Regions:
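Short, strongly hydrophobic alpha-helical membrane anchors
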Residues: 1-22
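Cytoplasmic-side transmembrane-helix entry/capping segments in multi-pass membrane proteins
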Residues: 50-58, 81-85, 106-117, 141, ...
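Short, structured motif recognition centered on aromatic/hydrophobic residues
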Residues: 54-58, 65-71, 140, 144, ...
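C-terminal ends of transmembrane helices
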Residues: 35-45, 68, 93-106, 151-161, ...
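A cytosolic-side transmembrane-helix exit/cap motif
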Residues: 71-79, 103-109, 128-138, 155-166, ...
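Structural signature of hydrophobic alpha-helical transmembrane segments
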Residues: 19-31, 76-90, 134-146
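The first (N-terminal) embedded transmembrane alpha-helix
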Residues: 24-37, 55-58, 176
């Protein structure tokens, strides 16, 4: 019996390690996607190289840093793991020196942004679940991870955050994170559930862009 218990324990540890690495990969891919958006914003505002790199890093990591601080994952992964900083800097340099090529790819950039949104939403919700947060808090952490960096980026360049004006931005992140959290109740630590959550978020965001779906805005008197 002890032998069988040991095997079960090892299997559980291996599964947790796989899930942890899966979430880290999602976080890193999302980091690069959002770093590109931050760098593009910097170049558009004619900011120097240092500023572009700062915006690249902020857009890619601010949401994750806020999430980690709130759930007690200290120090935050973005400053503890060299890969986050490296990916952010690479994305910033690529955008700064080859912006003319990236500027021609409006649709691909929107796709990368939507992909980053979905990856961060499910990675944020998944990490919150791993830290034993409740369902509501886990959904909020997924949304914060997905939209936090973009909000800080826009504030730094004196713009209204795109999350308040774009086509179903936060709503898409909310939907993806909710799928992960609800799915985890029935299928704990399930990679397919995370994949479905990502597809829901990315799909909803791209459909909103295509069809110009937006939340209603209050009407002001003339």
């Amino acid at each position: 019996m002890q032998y069988l218990a040991g095997i079960v324990t090892l299997m559980a540890i291996d599964e947790l390690a796989i899930i942890s690495e899966f979430l880290k990969v999602l976080d890193l891919v999302g980091t690069f996607a959002f770093a590109l958006s931050g760098a593009v914003s910097g170049v558009k505002h004619r900011i120097d190289l240092f500023g572009v790199l700062v915006l690249s890093f902020v857009a890619a990591t601010a949401g994750g840093i806020m999430r980690d601080v709130l759930i007690g994952a200290i120090p935050p992964a973005a400053v503890q793991d060299w890969r986050y900083i490296t990916l952010s800097l690479v994305a910033g340099l690529v955008t700064f020196f080859w912006y003319s090529l990236i500027a021609k790819m409006k649709s691909p950039v929107q796709i990368f942004d939507a992909l980053g949104l979905g990856l961060f939403a499910i990675a944020g919700a998944g990490k919150a679940i791993a830290f034993h947060l409740g369902p509501g808090a886990a959904v909020l952490m997924g949304v914060l991870t997905a939209i936090g960096g973009g909000m800080v980026r826009d504030v730094l360049v004196s713009e209204v955050p795109v999350v308040f004006t774009a086509e179903l931005y936060a709503v898409a992140a909310l939907a993806g994170a909710a799928v992960v959290v609800v799915g985890n109740i029935f299928f704990p630590s399930s990679v397919p559930v995370a994949a479905i959550g990502g597809i829901v978020c990315v799909g909803l965001r791209l459909m909103a862009i295509r069809n110009r779906w937006k939340l209603p805005v209050a009407q002001q008197p003339d």
